[in-house]
Amino acid sequence: MSCPVIELAQQLIRRPSLSPDDAGCQALMIERLRAIGFTVEPMDFGDTQNFWAWRGHGETLAFAGHTDVVPAGDADRWINPPFEPTIRDGMLFGRGAADMKGSLAAMVVAAERFVAQYPNHRGRLAFLITSDEEASAKNGTVKVVETLMARNERLDYCLVGEPSSTEVVGDVVKNGRRGSLTCNLTIHGVQGHVAYPHLADNPVHRAAPMLAELVNIEWDKGNEFFPPTSMQIANVQSGTGSNNVIPGDMFVQFNFRFSTELTDEMIKARVVSLLEKYQLRYSVEWWLSGQPFLTGRGKLVDAVVSAIEHYNEIKPQLLTNGGTSDGRFIARMGAQVVELGPVNATIHKINECVNAADLQLLARMYQRVMEQLVA
């Protein structure tokens, strides 16, 4: 017997939607949603396709996700071509199977089943879908959220279908995310010949004590919901490639994943004070890709936990670790935001796959959340 969730997931995987190219995925979803009474508003920005769809009125539960995927890598190393979905030993293989076309299929089928059972549901059910989450994320969910906020759209609850689970579907629910702040720092020196250091000013030597102190700072101890803030140097560049030239500049890029114990302004101030302490000549640029957010126990978390306990008979962990997601933008609307999706063990990897039975289970969980919040 065919399964509508698996069939839709396979149809989506066949569309090679390398970010930000949607490759027809959203048209497929929109067709299904319009067929059950959704109003669909395309919101394209630049090279990115997005849509906002809704059905009903009042208290709003949105399902959010992305149709874009990362590159497949070496296709010859896949057990099957990455955009030709195949099922082996109960596992659905294909780029995007876990991140996150499987979730998208589960959302749409859950909505179809929900509307069939509750054609006159009391609340509003919505979808917020983008084709730019894996790349720059500049013309995707953030732009849709800005548009919705400008016209005072209501959004009470949002379930993001990111692959949150680690071993079995539903074992982990993300009810928040750390903030992400990147510093692009250039230390200025004076280029010269290595044999005449008194005629130059080596920026690497100048920066070394400051960087040593920077990496040893304990920024905070975290709290009940967040691990301690982490700072990692990601890139260091200096020199001409020649062994007889003292470099004129040194570029250092570092990233903070920060908890609710700090603000981005507090981090910036401490870094600048450190630069001043060591009397460095510098240029600095900051990129804040997201503030930390947290959804405490409430209607959405309770509904998601209840759905998982009902179908998988496990109590999920509520965690905030891992990378950022589009939930950071949606949280700006004042919505309760959680992430629930399939197992993430193979995301972005060669032979990405997801248990086909997990997608069927996920669709049931999503439907139960709908029933608890907007039926």
Curated annotation (Swiss-Prot):
Homodimer. Its EC number is 3.5.1.18. Gene3D superfamilies: Zn peptidases. Pfam families: M20_dimer, Peptidase_M20. InterPro entries: ArgE/DapE_CS, Bact_exopeptidase_dim_dom, DapE_proteobac, Peptidase_M20, Peptidase_M20_dimer, Peptidase_M20A. One of its GO terms (biological process) is L-arginine biosynthetic process. Its cofactor is Zn(2+); Co(2+). The active site is at 68, 133 (proton acceptor). Keywords: Amino-acid biosynthesis, Cobalt, Diaminopimelate biosynthesis, Hydrolase, Lysine biosynthesis, Metal-binding, Zinc. Zn(2+) 2 binds at residues 99, 134, 348. This is Succinyl-diaminopimelate desuccinylase. The lineage of its organism: Bacteria, Pseudomonadati, Pseudomonadota, Gammaproteobacteria, Enterobacterales. It catalyses: N-succinyl-(2S,6S)-2,6-diaminopimelate + H2O = (2S,6S)-2,6-diaminopimelate + succinate. Binds 2 Zn(2+) or Co(2+) ions per subunit.
